[in-house]
Amino acid sequence: EVVGALDVDLDLDHGELAAFDLLDADVFGLGRALEQVTDQVLEEVLAWQRRPLEALYPVIYLDAIIVKVRDGGHVRNKAAHIAVGVDMDGIKHVLGIWVQQTEGAKFWAAVCAELANRGVRDVLIVCCDGLTGFPDAIAATWPEATVQTCVVHLIRAATRFVSYTDRKSVSAALKPIYQAANEEAALEALEAFTASEFGRRYPSAVKTFTDAWDRFTPFLAFPPELRRVIYTTNSIESLNYQLRKVSKSRGHFPNDQAVVKLLWLAICDIEDKRARARAKERGLPATQRKAGGRLVEGGIVTNWKRALEQLALAYPDRINPHL
């Protein structure tokens, strides 16, 4: 709606601004005018970024994408930090976007503190990457939160130095570790992988898991439905994929504020387009519907009722007052 009101057609599914390219606009002398256009949404962006939040989020996903931002006379890589929360109804919400020079635990601690200031008193499980210092940064705000390393990130790190021809086979060989019934079985699977041909060929893959073991294993204590919710940041990875397409097509952003504004507009535009596509297919048989579901905002976690039941068993004193 905001995008439509501004008459700026963000054709983000193809990674393009159909009406304008905000970053190349200076070449044509349009930079000032386009800055005024995006300034019209700044007030709404700030209201969104500062809005009150729920007291409890059962799960929060934390991640970041790298964007290029003009800084003085240079273009630097900066991290756009993104938080996605799952509320008690299983509905996903983008809680905010923050820009910083690098993705670091110290800055994430500030993000968590800001979320607390906006009303988040407790989080049961925080899913994040394996950044050193992340657990301490989260514990400073939510000391009882379970910190779970994203398994997708972990596998990606474990296969970073694996040859392309072996990558699929190594990924398959790692599955028994993160699909194990419990931590003991996972450790046995890791030992088996370590002794295997792939384990001997790629000791860095073994080290990735051993170094992250304490942050990797929390989800192994939960039943399958809850594991699927917490062991990966897929909810935010799909969002990041779309936002990376936008940022790459831009080349670089003029400043940090432009990053937040454009990424917010991107989220609005993607969700609006998907909603319109679903509306067109309403009434058709499921086999004929091709429109995608919600990207993140307003989407409901699959099998949430069952996952919530398991959360209530695992964290009764913290979750029951909110049921």
What kind of region is each of these model predictions?
Residues 176-323:
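Acidic/histidine-rich catalytic cores and adjacent linkers
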Residues 38-128, 132, 136-144, 235:
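RNase H-like nuclease fold core
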Residues 75, 100-104, 126, 150, ...:
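A generic short alpha-helical patch detector that favors 3-5-residue windows
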Residues 31-35, 59, 77, 105-109, ...:
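Amphipathic alpha-helical transducer elements in NTP-driven molecular machines
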Residues 19, 25, 35-43, 67, ...:
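A broad, structural surface signal
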Residues 1-30:
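N-terminal low-complexity segments that are often proline-rich with Ser/Thr-Pro
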Residues 33, 125-132, 137-173:
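Conserved beta-strand -> loop -> alpha-helix junction used to position metal-binding or nucleic-acid-contacting
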